[in-house]
């Protein structure tokens, strides 16, 4: 489509899927192109703007990310993806306590609980608090008993706490 300079119409959900595809591939330049094209068609879409925030974070454009967080803050506090982006923003800037606050808000929405507990636990590891990290890795395992990441980190926390 880009190479042939063709224009196609996609609804918001289709653009979101395209952007997620490129984000998961780690192809942030194509994700950014998809976001920009999507915003030219759907300039007021909060979902697309949240994906733009994800792209800014991956590209480490923290000034633009903060501007977008400020713009979306009031209208997106009930959106798990937005709250995770805020948590990632503060985590990347070395503020794990603020990151945990946003993850706690997202947990109240009862979506992606396994991911959020792992995220919170990782932040507690960054704070050198293996006890609280262990609690959240264990909670993540309660939501997904087959999560190898959580299980490995539970063992790591027990080791850090010198528990058999």
What is the role of each PLM region?
Residues 38, 71-72, 105-106, 139-140:
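Canonical positions in the second alpha-helix
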Residues 41, 74-76, 109-110, 143:
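Structural marker of alpha-solenoid helical repeat scaffolds
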């Amino acid at each position: 489509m880009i190479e042939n300079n063709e224009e196609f119409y996609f609804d918001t959900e289709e653009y979101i899927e395209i952007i997620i595809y490129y984000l998961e591939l780690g192809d942030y330049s194509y994700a950014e192109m998809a976001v920009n094209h999507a915003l030219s068609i759907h300039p007021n879409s909060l979902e697309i703007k949240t994906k733009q925030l994800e792209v800014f974070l991956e590209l480490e454009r923290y000034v633009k990310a903060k501007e977008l967080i400020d713009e979306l803050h009031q209208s997106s506090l009930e959106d798990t993806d937005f709250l995770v982006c805020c948590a990632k923003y503060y985590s990347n800037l070395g503020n794990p306590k603020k990151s945990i606050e946003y993850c706690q808000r997202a947990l109240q929405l009862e979506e992606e609980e396994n991911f959020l507990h792992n995220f919170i636990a990782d932040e507690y590891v960054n704070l050198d608090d293996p006890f609280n990290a262990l609690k959240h890795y264990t909670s993540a395992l309660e939501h997904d008993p087959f999560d190898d990441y959580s299980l490995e980190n539970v063992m790591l926390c027990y080791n850090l706490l010198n528990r058999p």
